[in-house]
């Protein structure tokens, strides 16, 4: 699963997801892509599940690119802990995704195979997505 090797700070504010994605919203590497239509936090487990589903479906053919990286730590408090006494410990990592962001790209395969593989990956995502073709 993806996570940063090291970060400057262990914990982050949650922040807000307003507006659309102005970067990472064009196809750069492959010919087909999966684009987010809603804002969400996508966990490293979800990213990995989608990647595995795509690569397993195309079977040695083509190449896939993961265009998002989980660089935000999400903290959780221990169960049955009283309020106060600081922020919880980082438990998992998420990628902040805004509408328009490209999640995965694929190349070197036929369109029908790419559409099938990307739709399987889309079912692993917690948001609505769309299949797009470059050009």
From Swiss-Prot:
Keywords: Chloroplast, Plastid, Ribonucleoprotein, Ribosomal protein. Belongs to the universal ribosomal protein uL16 family. GO terms for biological process: mitochondrial translation. Disulfide bonds: none annotated. GO terms for molecular function: rRNA binding; structural constituent of ribosome. The keyword Chloroplast applies. The keyword Plastid applies. This is Large ribosomal subunit protein uL16c. CDD domains: Ribosomal_L16_L10e. NCBIfam families: rplP_bact. It comes from Oenothera argillicola. GO terms for cellular component: chloroplast; mitochondrial large ribosomal subunit. It is found in: Plastid, Chloroplast. Part of the 50S ribosomal subunit.
